[in-house]
Amino acid sequence: MKLIIANRRYSSWSLRGWLAAKQSCLAFEAELVDIYAPDWPVRRSSGVFAQANGKVPILIDGESVIWNALAIIDWLDRKSGGTRFWPAAGPARAFATSAAAEMQAGFLALRQACPMNCMRHYPGYAIAAEALPDIARVDELWSTGLARFGGPWLTGAAFTAADA
């Protein structure tokens, strides 16, 4: 399998795909693309990138092309036996499914106000007021999962899609 990603330091979507691939314990090769390169606008509109709407991460598994971090997590879960990224059943599975979907689709104000850079520290960074409800919701979501299922991961003892 090949996982095509941008730099994990700056791309939370690429980081999610890479974390899932690592946690799956399946063999994969990571290919880094420079989304800031001058030729990226042309590259992203052709080949496998066009199929993925010009976005990363992209997982290539034989003739199958999977894009979107949550779709990649689901694909890897099925390839690794169907129990790697989702709790078996019940409340933990319901929480993991809902939390992963919310984190995938939500928090737009937070994403716009706080671009990701894992290699920098920004003392005194003023967070936009529009992002504060998203930050409160992330805190609530994570606190709820840890308290309800006992940690150390969001739904208990094992890493799941919600943690990616």
Predicted feature descriptions by range:
Residues 1-127:
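GST-like domain detector, emphasizing the conserved glutathione-binding G-site
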